[in-house]
């Protein structure tokens, strides 16, 4: 069982657009939604599922809109919420910004989309690329000779339409890894992991098949093999285009890609990561007068690599004033609204160490520090480098017309949730 009706409301609870799918819930029931939501909010008991009588309201908020689904019987809640988020995604791809104004400007196309997205309360066609084939931005169906059914009906490859042509055939592949790190005040790594993804931008004619090979040291969990220098990927998720049966047999990632931009796969490595940028800080507080910081930043990756746009965010007391800075490289800025100083280094080569000193005045009567000390956080991006060591060995493009295509591969390592606690 899924949704009876779907509504889009403004912030006051006024219905902008709605679609009744099953006819078993009075459409005026939605008038109870906003009063119940405000009441629960005041009580501090707000929930994503609200109830009035026998009707359930499942809702999400996006910008200045509420998307609400109603149901009278036992609904599959996870399915309904997945559908609501999919509606947001599809509408955003059509209108770029999903907000009250874009709803008011596109009533016709939204009704068409709601008819295709769900049928009798069950999600149907939710792939925006398929929807864009026969629901255009102007809200009129494409007329190309005889009416044709959507790709999902005629084509086994529902994520890619036929007849795509490019003058220049190219594929761009990005291996992006984010490092999550938490270091204790005494320098012990408490938590470290790598969250990676392979993202692609595909501009290829026809119906090409791509084969991607990763380096031999990469293992997928449950391979049953263990090497000391292997990289064992966990929580691997593939785009629907990947032929899983072939992958299960020989670990080849073979697929017919969607057109344009998409995420081919994501993965995680729950492994000990040597901190790429190490921070040591000494903070001296002189009672009722001043506080001094000495912060040392060291890059702990190979000399041939360089971290770009490094930002080191150092928390300072709310009542600090009269800042003075001295640094061996980069620039330092005080951001009083965030109670922090930001040390920016545009280019930070591997194997280097830099120093920054800061001095602040303190009021004679200090505010009591009840919240403890926030950690130092670091932002960075290292091109041509992956922490895990994952590499693309080959990317083959096979298409029956035999055209030549250019594959471009790049690697990026960046910060995720990267924090170092202070003494």
From Swiss-Prot:
Domain (MHD) ranges: 168-421
Q: Where are the transmembrane segments?
A: none
Write down any Gene Ontology CC term.
early endosome
Under Gene3D superfamilies, the record lists:
3.30.450.60, Mu homology domain, subdomain B
PANTHER family annotated for this entry?
Answer: AP COMPLEX SUBUNIT MU (PTHR10529)
Chain positions with N-acetylserine modification: 2
Q: Which gene encodes it?
A: Ap1m1
Question: How does the record classify its membrane topology?
Answer: Peripheral membrane protein
Primary localisation category: Golgi
Q: Which domain of life is it from?
A: Eukaryota
Source species, please? Mus musculus (Mouse)
- SUPFAM superfamilies to which the protein is assigned, alphabetical: Second domain of Mu2 adaptin subunit (ap50) of ap2 adaptor, SNARE-like
Gene Ontology biological-process annotations: endosome to melanosome transport; intracellular protein transport; melanosome assembly; platelet dense granule organization; vesicle-mediated transport
Subcellular compartments? Golgi apparatus; Cytoplasmic vesicle, Clathrin-coated vesicle membrane
Protein name according to UniProt: AP-1 complex subunit mu-1
Question: What's its job?
Answer: Subunit of clathrin-associated adaptor protein complex 1 that plays a role in protein sorting in the trans-Golgi network (TGN) and endosomes. The AP complexes mediate the recruitment of clathrin to membranes and the recognition of sorting signals within the cytosolic tails of transmembrane cargo molecules.
Q: Which family does it belong to?
A: Belongs to the adaptor complexes medium subunit family.
């Amino acid at each position: 069982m899924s949704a009876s009706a779907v509504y889009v409301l403004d912030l006051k609870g006024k219905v902008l657009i709605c679609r009744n799918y099953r006819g078993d819930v009075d459409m005026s029931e939605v008038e109870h939604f906003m009063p119940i939501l405000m009441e629960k909010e005041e009580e501090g008991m707000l929930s994503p599922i609200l109830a009035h009588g026998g009707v359930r309201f499942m809702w999400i908020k996006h910008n200045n809109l509420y998307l609400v689904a109603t149901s009278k019987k036992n609904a599959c809640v996870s399915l309904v919420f997945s559908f609501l988020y999919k509606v947001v995604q599809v509408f955003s791809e059509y209108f770029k910004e999903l907000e009250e104004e874009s709803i008011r400007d596109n009533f016709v196309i939204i009704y068409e989309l709601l008819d295709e997205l769900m049928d009798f309360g069950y999600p149907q066609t939710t792939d925006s690329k398929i929807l864009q084939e026969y629901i255009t931005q102007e809200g009129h169906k494409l007329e190309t000779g005889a009416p044709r059914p959507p790709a999902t009906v005629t084509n086994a490859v529902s994520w890619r339409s036929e007849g795509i042509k490019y003058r220049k055939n190219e594929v761009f592949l990005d291996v992006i890894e984010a490092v999550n790190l938490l270091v204790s005040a005494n320098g012990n790594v408490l938590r470290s992991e790598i969250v990676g993804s392979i993202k692609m931008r595909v501009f290829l004619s026809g119906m090409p098949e791509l084969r991607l090979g990763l380096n031999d040291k990469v293992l997928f969990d449950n391979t049953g093999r263990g090497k000391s220098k292997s990289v064992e990927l966990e929580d691997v998720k593939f785009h629907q285009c990947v032929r899983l049966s072939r992958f299960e047999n020989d670990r080849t990632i073979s697929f017919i890609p969607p057109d344009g931009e998409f995420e081919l796969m994501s993965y995680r490595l729950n492994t000990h990561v040597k901190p790429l940028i190490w921070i040591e800080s000494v903070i001296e507080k002189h009672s009722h007068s001043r506080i001094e910081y000495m912060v040392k930043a060291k890059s702990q990756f190979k000399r041939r690599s360089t971290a770009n746009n490094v930002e080191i965010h150092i928390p300072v007391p709310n009542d600090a004033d009269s800042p003075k800075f001295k640094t061996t490289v980069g620039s330092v800025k005080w951001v009083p609204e965030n109670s922090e100083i930001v040390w920016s280094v545009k280019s930070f080569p591997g194997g280097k160490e830099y120093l920054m000193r800061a001095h602040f005045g303190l009021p004679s009567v200090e505010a009591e520090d009840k919240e403890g000390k926030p950690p130092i956080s670091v932002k960075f991006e290292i091109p041509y480098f992956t922490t895990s060591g994952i590499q693309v060995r080959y990317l083959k493009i096979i298409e029956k017309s035999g055209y030549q295509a250019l594959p471009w591969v790049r690697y990026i390592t960046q910060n995720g949730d990267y924090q170092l606690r202070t003494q």
